[in-house]
């Protein structure tokens, strides 16, 4: 599988991210997933707008303009052997010394990969699929020492 990491397309086994990356240390980053049908990104402009809102929410400058994101995503799609796929990506604040304060000189890490989307049967398309809903209590568990410390570094 070919992935994208900081300006390079490379085999997934060659992709390396620093252990000091704030995404790893603090969960200091955002993600987005763009569905792709017949090699065409679905509602790309809306997904990139949501990415921008997420980046703004954690006060992280967007490392790319819309046209750059689109070009990277389209090239990643072209590297994959499947037509329907989900392009998943993360943008982190990058590698820096371990400190809750935002680093002034860190370069964001941009990682993207793509996986095939599941094929739905006609019955699933016409009749739907079962789902389960649950309350989202992730941020209510401040008593747990999880590695996502995003709440600590953004507020």
Name each model feature, range by range.
Residues 1-155:
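Conserved alpha/beta cores of soluble small-molecule-handling proteins
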């Amino acid at each position: 599988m070919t992935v994208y990491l900081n300006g390079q397309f490379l085999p997934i086994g060659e992709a390396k991210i620093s252990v000091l990356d704030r995404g790893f240390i603090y969960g200091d980053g955002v993600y987005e997933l763009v569905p792709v049908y017949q090699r065409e990104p679905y509602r790309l402009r809306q997904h990139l707008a949501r990415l921008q809102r997420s980046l703004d929410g954690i006060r992280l400058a967007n490392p790319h303009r819309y046209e750059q994101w689109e070009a990277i995503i389209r090239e990643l799609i072209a590297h994959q052997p499947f037509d329907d796929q989900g392009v998943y990506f993360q943008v982190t604040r990058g590698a820096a010394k371990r400190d809750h304060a935002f680093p002034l000189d860190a370069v964001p890490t941009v990682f993207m990969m793509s996986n095939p989307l599941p094929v739905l049967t006609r019955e699933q398309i016409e009749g739907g699929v079962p789902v389960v809903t649950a309350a989202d209590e992730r941020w209510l568990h401040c008593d747990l020492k999880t590695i996502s410390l995003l709440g600590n570094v953004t507020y």
